[in-house]
Amino acid sequence: MLSTLRRTLFALLACASFIVHAAAPDEITTAWPVNVGPLNPHLYTPNQMFAQSMVYEPLVKYQADGSVIPWLAKSWTHSEDGKTWTFTLRDDVKFSNGEPFDAEAAAENFRAVLDNRQRHAWLELANQIVDVKALSKTELQITLKSAYYPFLQELALPRPFRFIAPSQFKNHETMNGIKAPIGTGPWILQESKLNQYDVFVRNENYWGEKPAIKKITFNVIPDPTTRAVAFETGDIDLLYGNEGLLPLDTFARFSQNPAYHTQLSQPIETVMLALNTAKAPTNELAVREA
């Protein structure tokens, strides 16, 4: 713990990737209610989404304005009917263990996800993909059942279409676990102790801009009041989270203390009301329009 650190408190309105700016020290300690999990990029709870995003990356990435930009894929094209997409991958990316990230590795990850398609049935893209193959080391082709408007947007989601080194599959699959969380992202899970802490270190071989911080420790503190006390006593440097993880009254109290720097994000999610058109009464158009 660096005693000179001016502790920072973040209260976010929705879950987001953990970001540290260049002004931060080399090491920082924060807290989370649970361990980050085994960090299988293709599964859900107990894998913590923010931590999956620290280790694993997508072909394309969301921006704050909702646009989608190239990431592990540097460009793409699609057929006139919108069903066949060809991605040109970056040729300078390796997994944190040194394995190359190429079209074969990407295709293997898609296969692993789709072999467990029923688990991802909530995401329509998992139902739309009919074929994924490597055309060359840097060319990946994805074929869909039909033109699917939110294709790129769903590829950009934090899970399940992210990439782990194929050597870390178990029995050529990921649905029943992985050997180790080896991704292409800027962070490496160095150590994890159940109900105690998780330690991430910077991926020194990361292809992109490296984080300014070299090490992040997440202490496991389930109770929000205890987390707040740990922050006040200096046991942790930063609090981060949304309502429930960090009560807004606690945030309001800390924001009045000049010793702390507080920040409240803009909303980063869209809330919608979905109507079940297969069952009464919302199966009636007149009811839905009312």
Language-model regions, residue ranges each:
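N-terminal lobe/hinge region of extracytoplasmic solute-binding protein
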Residues: A31-E80, E108-R111, Q118, I182-G183
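Alpha-helical secondary-structure segments
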Residues: D102-N109, E139-T143, G185-P186, I213-K215, ...
